[in-house]
């Protein structure tokens, strides 16, 4: 497809989405010159604004002013994306294959894709909570539309190491230690031994092993570990912080290593404590230090009802009032946010630790619009809407009198994804300032997490950082989305390497290195997080324990995990690696020259794959696309464990979908596969996905009526229209198909 045609098609996908469907039946109320869905207006006007002391008329008028003032600039930024993409397409068509490095870089600078690096300077962020600034630890990402998931994640600040080990393949199912319906004491002993080995590694005793300890108690204001008739102390005397219970017989002992807390829980009457000579029933680890409540890639929020549900959950998390009725077996209980944890400090005073994860909220990017609010019959940009509403809903989370407040520093943390270069980051900075003024919040109350997941941001990362130097809270690599943009940006250059080979392509490691180097050089350590991406294989925790520690050794002080259990296991890595020391070493070594490698386009050196290899790539990606899309479109599930073609559960969201659809669109564009082969694979894989979902009573089969399956048609569009979709994003097609399905089935 010629470059200008791709650009026009991209605009058409977006503009069609902005104009409200004539069949729209949403009940609306006019406020602030906007037509707002009544369900959203009522929630904000009746539930939120009175609680936060904001006048409703002033709020809605100011809301409308921000939308009208900032919409033209938002449109300009999207038009600039299309303009640059058209120029890139033309360049690749004239220079197919891997570009000449010097000429390519010069071209990118000429068209403004690459900008000059800003002068040496560091970020100036203030009032950052310690969980972000000075604590290294795991980060969860959870869909905000699911209250149970949100509560589980918020409460995942503390997690049972014993449960995490026993319930996963972190302890191999072998040698009599297999998992089963009943408790396996052989497995239990392996868990206990793992825990003792861990304590010896990260909190060693001076002259003894934790495995030999017969009793723990407190003497002379210190932890006493009794072995035979001797008393042994921790090598690090400062590691002991406090206890609960009595000096002689504590019920818990609080320790600290690398800034993270460890709680030894003691109960000789407990089934596990009975088997342990010290009465130790569990080792509780500080786990998910921070959590991102997600309105973006892990949710399917396509209309006012969906958005209002998410906003309500976010509001109640900030008030501390979110609850959920949970059924387990024949009993039902109410899940709520955990209280803070209270100990007796080693000085005898009360010591209180935060009981919940520190929460970020991820807004959507600059591309999408949403029918929850209209202006002159057109949907407003969802990113502007998110910025205003997630902020006003977060105000209770900074209220000093709130016992379950989120931030003790008075900051609201917003992750902004899918930004292309410093101009777009500057737009976010301006938007946040407008929101602060609307809500009478001090300047830079809103902190921003900048996702480094688009190519134009990666190659201009320093400039992006400095555009938000007064409000930056993190930078984070998102390899999955970043790969999707890598493919789409250079779609016309030629056929790309296979999806799995992207992991070892030169640009990938250079991209990861550059993120850390830029963060360190711009002064993030001690002020903001430098993060890395998700471990997607939810059931392979043993493999995660072995491999994910590598992200810390590369300089990340946080990395994403798919579950509270994953957070607890990943937390052990931060005890074994002092990340801030690693960052000091990287700073001393000097910044690596990464730009040339980042610009290395992953065009395949040759395309002589065998028919079997092509079929494997087709089937793997088609199965992945269908397995995710069918739940997104027909069940409104934006993030879930999706079995791959080998029945291995993978945590899938829109980022993984973007890669799978873009690689096939690329191969189709360059004749590696044909449209007929794509359709044939989709139809075969639909049968596989149907079988994988056979146990779900709410599931609708895609086969054999493929033309009637909305999900199948969505998957087909994602591939066949993949070159047209702006930046390879899947949202325009997914949103349209989800709304179609809801309309067909009368779902609100």
Swiss-Prot record:
What is its cofactor?
A: Mg(2+)
Enzyme class, spelled out: transferase
Q: In Gene Ontology terms, what is one molecular function of this protein? A: magnesium ion binding
Which branch of life, at top level?
Bacteria
GO biological process terms, alphabetically, are: glyoxylate catabolic process; glyoxylate cycle; tricarboxylic acid cycle
The keyword Cytoplasm is annotated on this UniProt entry = yes
Q: What Pfam families does this protein's entry cite?
A: MS_C, MS_N, MS_TIM-barrel, MSG_insertion
Keywords of the record: Cytoplasm, Glyoxylate bypass, Magnesium, Metal-binding, Oxidation, Transferase, Tricarboxylic acid cycle
> Per UniProt, where does glyoxylate bind?
362, 453, 478-481
Residues annotated as carrying Cysteine sulfenic acid (-SOH) in the record are 639
Known catalytic reactions: glyoxylate + acetyl-CoA + H2O = (S)-malate + CoA + H(+)
Kindly list the GO CC terms recorded for this protein. cytosol
Has UniProt tagged this entry with the keyword Transferase? yes
- Please list the residues that bind Mg(2+): 453, 481
The active site lies at 362 (proton acceptor), 653 (proton donor)
The record's EC number reads: 2.3.3.9
Q: In which pathway does it act?
A: Carbohydrate metabolism; glyoxylate cycle; (S)-malate from isocitrate: step 2/2
Q: Where in the cell is it found?
A: Cytoplasm
- Where acetyl-CoA binds, per the record, is at 141, 148-149, 298, 335, 562
NCBIfam families linked: malate_syn_G (TIGR01345), PRK02999.1 (NF002825)
Instruction: State its role.
Output: Involved in the glycolate utilization. Catalyzes the condensation and subsequent hydrolysis of acetyl-coenzyme A (acetyl-CoA) and glyoxylate to form malate and CoA.
Spell out the family assignment given in the record's similarity comment: Belongs to the malate synthase family. GlcB subfamily.
Q: Oligomeric state and partners?
A: Monomer.
Q: What name does this protein carry?
A: Malate synthase G
| Species classification | Bacteria, Bacillati, Actinomycetota, Actinomycetes, Mycobacteriales
Originating gene: glcB
